């Protein structure tokens, strides 16, 4: 009977330990998923910022090009 009790306690102990390990892995997995989601959100925000900067640079390039074209035209065809 004592052997049966020890075996039962051993089985229960091992079951609790394995359950504890599974719960810990599950928590780690959830934390990793949260971090990945946060990284994706940051990536989306960074992409928006990059697009905004590229649009600003594009518009600045257009303005500089128009000014340069006007300067060249005035240089080639000066008004008197």
Curated annotation (Swiss-Prot):
<keyword id="KW-0929">Antimicrobial</keyword>
<keyword id="KW-0732">Signal</keyword>
<protein>
    <recommendedName>
        <fullName>Raniseptin-5</fullName>
    </recommendedName>
</protein>
<feature type="propeptide">
    <location>
        <begin position="23"/>
        <end position="49"/>
    </location>
</feature>
<keyword id="KW-0964">Secreted</keyword>
<feature type="signal peptide">
    <location>
        <begin position="1"/>
        <end position="22"/>
    </location>
</feature>
<dbReference type="InterPro" id="IPR004275">
    <property type="entry name" value="Frog_antimicrobial_propeptide"/>
</dbReference>
<keyword id="KW-0044">Antibiotic</keyword>
<dbReference type="GO" id="GO:0005576">
    <property type="term" value="C:extracellular region"/>
</dbReference>
<dbReference type="Pfam" id="PF03032">
    <property type="entry name" value="FSAP_sig_propep"/>
</dbReference>
<dbReference type="InterPro" id="IPR016322">
    <property type="entry name" value="FSAP"/>
</dbReference>
<keyword id="KW-0165">Cleavage on pair of basic residues</keyword>
<keyword id="KW-0878">Amphibian defense peptide</keyword>
<dbReference type="GO" id="GO:0042742">
    <property type="term" value="P:defense response to bacterium"/>
</dbReference>
<comment type="similarity">
    <text>Belongs to the frog skin active peptide (FSAP) family. Dermaseptin subfamily.</text>
</comment>
<comment type="function">
    <text>Has antibacterial activity.</text>
</comment>
């Amino acid at each position: 009977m004592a052997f049966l009790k020890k075996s039962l306690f051993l089985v229960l102990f091992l079951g609790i330990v394995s359950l504890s390990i599974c719960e810990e892995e599950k928590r780690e997995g959830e934390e990793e998923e949260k971090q990945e989601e946060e990284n994706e959100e940051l990536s989306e925000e960074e992409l928006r910022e990059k697009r905004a900067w590229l649009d600003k640079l594009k518009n600045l390039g257009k303005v500089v090009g128009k000014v340069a074209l006007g300067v060249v035209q005035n240089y080639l065809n000066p008004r008197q």
